[in-house]
Amino acid sequence: MSDDMALPLQFTDAAANKVKDLIADEENPNLRLRVYITGGGCSGFQYGFTFDDAMNEGDMTIEKQGVALVIDPMSLQYLVGGCVDYTEGLEGSRFIVTNPNAKSTCGCGSSFSI
């Protein structure tokens, strides 16, 4: 899709650039960044990120700058309208999710409740 606004989940340039760098370090061009939701964390749900070279039935792929972000259907329902970004700061560097569906988030931003 060429229109980023039509996508159910946004993927920033900063996140795409970092994924591209990490994939280059792994020397496996088939890797994709998988974003998923699991139960846990201090708020009930938590975000997870992992590299994956497999696609599962129902996975959605969002491509940007030659790299792919993959989301399973169960996680996607909690992430619609959100944005995956990459930040570097005093707290370290990490991927973060801005999620309009979250009613509350923990202080570090890695878990949320609905």
Curated annotation (Swiss-Prot):
UniProt keyword list: Iron, Iron-sulfur, Metal-binding
Pfam families to which the protein is assigned, alphabetical: Fe-S_biosyn
Signal peptide feature range: none
Named cofactor requirement(s): iron-sulfur cluster
Quaternary structure note: Homodimer.
Family according to the record: Belongs to the HesB/IscA family.
Protein name: Iron-sulfur cluster insertion protein ErpA
Lineage: Bacteria, Pseudomonadati, Pseudomonadota, Gammaproteobacteria, Enterobacterales
